[in-house]
Amino acid sequence: MSSILPFTPPVVKRLLGWKKSAGGSGGAGGGEQNGQEEKWCEKAVKSLVKKLKKTGRLDELEKAITTQNCNTKCVTIPSTCSEIWGLSTANTVDQWDTTGLYSFSEQTRSLDGRLQVSHRKGLPHVIYCRLWRWPDLHSHHELKAIENCEYAFNLKKDEVCVNPYHYQRVETPVLPPVLVPRHTEILTELPPLDDYTHSIPENTNFPAGIEPQSNYIPETPPPGYISEDGETSDQQLNQSMDTGSPAELSPTTLSPVNHSLDLQPVTYSEPAFWCSIAYYELNQRVGETFHASQPSLTVDGFTDPSNSERFCLGLLSNVNRNATVEMTRRHIGRGVRLYYIGGEVFAECLSDSAIFVQSPNCNQRYGWHPATVCKIPPGCNLKIFNNQEFAALLAQSVNQGFEAVYQLTRMCTIRMSFVKGWGAEYRRQTVTSTPCWIELHLNGPLQWLDKVLTQMGSPSVRCSSMS
């Protein structure tokens, strides 16, 4: 590695020798991109070494990296950005960006108060875990601290541990197979399939005070990401709960199928593309479907035509586009970031305007009507799907018959509008009345449903030429 600074201390060179390299980058620009990455890494390590020398923790960092041992001590730096990087204005770690992927001038502060260092910004533990352990790390959602880390990022102490071996990658939980009878004896009486397409959805504000139902969120997001702690207040839920009730995860009170039949396990498998996204303007589909292969992607209003981590709506043309749609498109901006991590899907509003989400899985978690539309303000994120919750529902629905399983297909579709909301509290009461919106199809759950339905056979209600 060629030296890119006037002087590179030996300890920096040693630490850089342990840097994990991402997979080979193809294309003509690969060499230039790798050179820029090496420059960034050297500056990041040199900045950290300079700070740790003052506190005497440098040896512990080198020990942790060279031995790759999680039993090493915490390697801490002050949790204020100003102390970390020598700036005079205090700027708490809570204001760091979660990814470190945006480009800005070196050692400057952005208008929103977050700090950029050497053309990038990010949470310090994410930066150094990416550098020394997981080059493909996207977000702090993918990390959880080990139990004996006293200064883990999620503890929000005055100092934060950046020992890369004090963090673990969040693993995707293995979903148990669903046991499906070869020929299901369907219940004689089943509840009718709910149809929400023609009803006016209710609205609710972002659930800032709701306790999450899953332990797979490894760390509390910074205050800028309004978290889901506490209990729901009446003011937050602008909806009437007597219009519908979520499906319960408790055992059904209906009689189950005949268990003397041959049960076949149907397993879940991850698809090559975890979701497909279609873009609409009012009731018209615009452009091609975007197939998401990366665990983190953004849907924005810009114009990059060939990035697997971005679905850029600014490229798409529509001869029927009216002035309202055109104006709305200009306000999409950075749009929404979608994460698929540990079997969970998160939506983060990056735009300066709110986004509006209709997720039946999320609505059930919070006890809302299945068609409720949730407003996510700028800078906030929300878990919009959970594979384990879906697996529990699927296992229960198999006992209720073909129609109950088929109804779960609606849970695998998530609708999201930009800038303009819809529902009972808005002038626009259907998603097809909003100027710009997208529809996500979650491919893994949909393919799992397909395999289960194929195994189950036919629905109980027969369809004849006379029906």
Curated annotation (Swiss-Prot):
Residue intervals of the MH2 domain: 274-467
Positions with a binding annotation for Zn(2+): C74, C149, C161, H166
Recorded GO MF terms: chromatin binding; co-SMAD binding; disordered domain specific binding; DNA binding; DNA-binding transcription activator activity, RNA polymerase II-specific; DNA-binding transcription factor binding; double-stranded DNA binding; I-SMAD binding
Residues modified to Phosphoserine: S240, S245, S250, S255, S458, S460, S464, S465, S467
PROSITE patterns: MH1, MH2
CDD domains: MH1_SMAD_2_3, MH2_SMAD_2_3
Region (Disordered): 207-251
Protein's cellular compartments: Cytoplasm; Nucleus
PTM section of the record: In response to TGF-beta, phosphorylated on the C-terminal SXS motif by TGF-beta and activin type 1 receptor kinases, phosphorylation declines progressively in a KMT5A-dependent manner. Phosphorylation in this motif is required for interaction with a number of proteins including SMURF2, SNON and SMAD4 in response to TGF-beta. Dephosphorylated in this motif by PPM1A leading to disruption of the SMAD2/3-SMAD4 complex, nuclear export and termination of the TGF-beta signaling. In response to decorin, the naturally occurring inhibitor of TGF-beta signaling, phosphorylated on Ser-240 by CaMK2. In response to TGF-beta, ubiquitinated by NEDD4L; which promotes its degradation. Monoubiquitinated, leading to prevent DNA-binding. Deubiquitination by USP15 alleviates inhibition and promotes activation of TGF-beta target genes. Ubiquitinated by RNF111, leading to its degradation: only SMAD2 proteins that are 'in use' are targeted by RNF111, RNF111 playing a key role in activating SMAD2 and regulating its turnover.
InterPro entries on file: Dwarfin (IPR013790), MAD_homology1_Dwarfin-type (IPR003619), MAD_homology_MH1 (IPR013019), SMAD-like_dom_sf (IPR017855), SMAD_dom_Dwarfin-type (IPR001132), SMAD_FHA_dom_sf (IPR008984), SMAD_MH1_sf (IPR036578)
Key words, A-Z: Acetylation, Cytoplasm, DNA-binding, Metal-binding, Nucleus, Phosphoprotein, Transcription, Transcription regulation, Ubl conjugation, Zinc
Keyword Cell inner membrane included in the entry's annotation: no
SUPFAM superfamilies the record matches: SMAD MH1 domain, SMAD/FHA domain
KW Membrane (keyword) present: no
Record PTM N-acetylserine, positions in chain: S2
Sequence ranges of Polar residues compositional bias: 207-217, 233-243
Phosphothreonine modifications at: T8, T220
Family: Belongs to the dwarfin/SMAD family.
Function description: Receptor-regulated SMAD (R-SMAD) that is an intracellular signal transducer and transcriptional modulator activated by TGF-beta (transforming growth factor) and activin type 1 receptor kinases. Binds the TRE element in the promoter region of many genes that are regulated by TGF-beta and, on formation of the SMAD2/SMAD4 complex, activates transcription. Promotes TGFB1-mediated transcription of odontoblastic differentiation genes in dental papilla cells. Positively regulates PDPK1 kinase activity by stimulating its dissociation from the 14-3-3 protein YWHAQ which acts as a negative regulator.
Name of the featured protein: Mothers against decapentaplegic homolog 2
Organism of derivation: Mus musculus (Mouse)
Name of the gene this protein is made from: Smad2
